[in-house]
Structures are given as C-alpha cells and as structure tokens.
Amino acid sequence: MAKKPLQLDEKGHRKFGMLDKLAYAAGDAGCNLSFGLKGTVQTFWLVYMMMETGLLSILLLIVQAWDAINDPIIGAMIDADQRKYKMGKFKTYIFIGAVGLIVGGAAVFLPFPGAGPVLKAVLFILGYIIWDAAYTMANVPYGSMLSLVTEDAGERAQLSTWRSVGGMVGGMLPGIILPMIIWKDVFDPETGEKLGQDLLGDRVFWAALLMGGLAFVFFMFMIKKITLRVDEYSVKTGEDAPKFNVVRAFGNFIKNRPAVGATIAAMGMFLGMQSATTANSIMFAAYFKQAQLSGLVMMVGFLPMFIFMPFIKKLVDKFGKKEAATAGTVVSLVGGLVMLLFPMVPMSLALPVYMVGLILFGLGMGVYTCVSWAMMSDAIDYNEWKFGTREEGTVYSLHSFFRKLAQGIGPSIVIALLGAIGYVEKLGTTGQSQEVVIGSCWLVAGLYLFSAVCQFVGIGLIFNLDKKTLAKMTEELNARRAAAEIAE
C-alpha cells in the first residue's frame, strides 16, 4: 500500500496536526512526571524525615532564593544563545534538563530519617537545587516553544489544551498512584483500632527515580516528533542588533498586563492547590484515615477539565479565551464556598461535601487550565506589540519564576500554619490532637477559596486581551512582520 504523501505548509514545514499536539503534550507529561512529586516533598520531609515545621518552612523559602536567580538567568541565557545546535537550541536545552531530572528528582528524596538537623538541611537544599535547575532547564524552553510551533491562535489554543492534558497525565502517577503505595495503616496493638497512617519513605525515593526515567522517555518523544515552524533564532546578532537587557525585559513584563494577569491567576492556582497538598495529605491520613485515596479524590475533582477538551477551540472561537476562562473562575468561586462547609458537617457527610466543592472548583478551572498556556503565548505577542520585542524566554521564565515562587512560598506558609495550630512532627499523622486535625480541614478549604479568588482577579480583572483586542493585535503584528520581510 502506497504511503500517504506528507502534507507541507507554504513554508515547507509539515502541516500542523495531531502529532504536534501529542508531542507537545508529552513534554508537559515529562515535566510533571518528575516535578509532580513536588507536592510530596513537604509531606516526605515533615512526616518521614520528621523535620521541625519551623526549619522546613525556612528551608523552603531559602530554595526559592535559588529560583529567583535560576529562572530569569536561564531564560535570558536561552534568549541570548545564538549558537547552532544539531537538535536546535530549545530541544538541546530540554534534553539537558531531562537528564538532570533523573538525578535531581531522586536526590531530593534521599531517605535518611536518622540524620541530624544540619545534615538533613544540607541534603534538602542540595537535592532541591539540582532538581529545580534541571526542571527549569527543560521547562523554560519547552514553554516558549508553543509560540514557535504555530502562529495560528486556534492552533495555539489546541496546543495549550494538549499541554494541560499532558500535564494531567504526567501528574497522575505521582499524584494519584503514589499515595496508594507510600502509606501504610497503623493500628492500636491492643484494640486493633485503626489510628491513622504512616509514610513509607524508601518507596518515595525509588518512585522519584522511576518518574525521572519515564520523564526522559516522554521528553525524547517530544524532541523527535514536534515541528517548530517559527525561527527560534529570531533575535539577530551583530552591531545593529539590539542588546539583550534583562532589567528592561523585567520592566516590560511588569507593564505587560496580560502576562501579569495570567501570572497572578497561575500564582493563585498554585498557592491554593499546591499549598493544599501537604495539608490535604495530613488531613486525609488523620481526619479521613484514608491517605491512599487522596490522589484518587483529587483526580475525580479535576476530571471535569477533560469535558472542555473537545470544545475548547469552539469556545475560544465563539467567546474568546479571556471571556470563557473568566466564566470558569466564577464557578470555581462557588466551589470554594461550598468547600468551606465540609469541616462543619457530620463525618458521614464531610467527604461528599468536600467532593462537591472540589468538583465545582475543578469544573470552573477546566476552561482556564485548557487555555492558560495559550494566554501566555498571547502575552508574548503582546510584548512584541507594545514594546517591539518578543523575549519569549524571558517573559516565560519570569512567569515560570512567579509560579514557582507561589509553589514554594505557599507550602512554606502552610507548614508554618500547621506548626501554629499545634502540629507536632514527632507524632506523625497518627498522634495529632483533634484540634490540629480539624484545623487542617479549615486550612484546605480556605486555600481552595483563596485560589479561586486569585484566578478571578487575574483573568477577569487584569488580563486585558479580550476577543476583540486580540484580533486587533494579531492583525497589526502580521502587518509588521510582512513589512519587515519585504524590507529585507
């Protein structure tokens, strides 16, 4: 049977299609297979390594100082790099980061609970720095690639949706299956009553090593199969080329309303959802006494995102990204309010009420999740529209920095709050007082509501690229680029 001829676009590239979407999804699956374990870091060091809440909270803040240096510098380095690589610039950086994730992911979960406080602190900081640097090396160029795969707004929205799908798939193993194998039931030896659950730290280490290896496989699939249709070496070199200025780029980012709005929404999402992970694990182990179900419950809560997948392009075409995502944030607000009820109802109703609130939250967040990365791609175009430079790597890396800052500061605050309500690390999850257990329930509910509020403010009030403005921006940018090509 004759092979179907390869269809090419007007520039000679393979036409955009399903292979691009699957490959791009595989990239975020790779990122999340390893870094999806981040939600387990605090639980591992708090419950298994028995690190004091105050010390762990401080260490989490310290490693964010590394983020402050790490993200923008790597983004600027990629923007300024004009060397020619066999795989291409972005794919080469992604490959290096993918290798580093195998080592770094395991390093942060070295199981030495008997070590002294100083050694524990050193192990935590070194392991986390290696892991975080590798993630940034892979994730910054990966995120920037969305605007290089296609220039079509609808196709970018599809890529953003598939990225979210890849992220969800990649997060399922560490987020859902891992809790089922790393917790063990603890019973009273005299009465046989179930007291709660304890963490099996050795299994976390081997799981992290395995996740890093699987992530590498996903990254290699993406590197080999995706096609970049926009020149990744678009920043010209030579005497007439504008010099790259990190300070100016940061100033432009702050003045870039779409980038700021999308970043605030993302920070809110991570401050709520990611921060809730530690309190959620402790709550499920101590309150519901079913920690192995925590990941499964989270999956059920966020499955509604998949409802929007087949319709996201139609929703975007009809209403616009901002308009559709804003409506979703209102539904998330309702879910957050419902979740405030579960600590007040009888135990028999607590889990169902929690689930209703979580499903509403996930349903509302579904649209935003599907288009969030396409919105950042639009923000990069906005940077070019308003300031004359795209600066993909820097805009994306600053967005990534603030996201990761939220991921780091949030858990640090949550751990400090757990200490404030009386959590005693040496008692694990089985010996905490009832006040601490109920306090963790209120903490989880409050974090989800806070997350929904931030998403509404970021997308509904700050992000200013509605459907009409986006069309105007795209038209003007296309005219500029056409004029520049004629001038050359």
Residue ranges of predicted features:
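Membrane-embedded alpha-helical bundles of multi-pass transporters/translocases
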Residues: A2-E488
